[in-house]
UniProtKB/Swiss-Prot annotation:
It is a single-pass membrane protein. GO terms for biological process: ATP biosynthetic process; proton transmembrane transport. Keywords: ATP synthesis, CF(0), Hydrogen ion transport, Ion transport, Membrane, Mitochondrion, Transmembrane, Transmembrane helix, Transport. This is ATP synthase protein 8. F-type ATPases have 2 components, CF(1) - the catalytic core - and CF(0) - the membrane proton channel. The keyword ATP-binding does not apply. It comes from the Eukaryota. The chain crosses the membrane at residues 10-30. The gene is MT-ATP8. GO terms for cellular component: mitochondrial membrane; proton-transporting ATP synthase complex. Mitochondrial membrane ATP synthase (F(1)F(0) ATP synthase or Complex V) produces ATP from ADP in the presence of a proton gradient across the membrane which is generated by electron transport complexes of the respiratory chain. F-type ATPases consist of two structural domains, F(1) - containing the extramembraneous catalytic core and F(0) - containing the membrane proton channel, linked together by a central stalk and a peripheral stalk. During catalysis, ATP synthesis in the catalytic domain of F(1) is coupled via a rotary mechanism of the central stalk subunits to proton translocation. Coiled coil: none annotated.
Length: 52
């Protein structure tokens, strides 16, 4: 048990760090791409508006 619990804590913290880095990369990427709005409004006849 003492050898398994720090490894689970390490993997859990590493996955949390990976998710946070991925969320920040997506946030900066879409905040840079938002003034164009050509990626999102290709068809203006669609019902659904994809807003980030």
């Amino acid at each position: 048990m003492p050898q398994i619990f720090p490894m689970n804590w390490f993997l859990m913290s590493l996955m949390i760090m990976m998710i946070l880095i991925f969320m920040t990369i997506n946030f900066y990427f879409f905040s840079m791409k938002m003034p164009n709005k050509n990626m999102f409004n290709l068809n203006k006849k669609t019902k659904y508006n994809f807003k980030w």
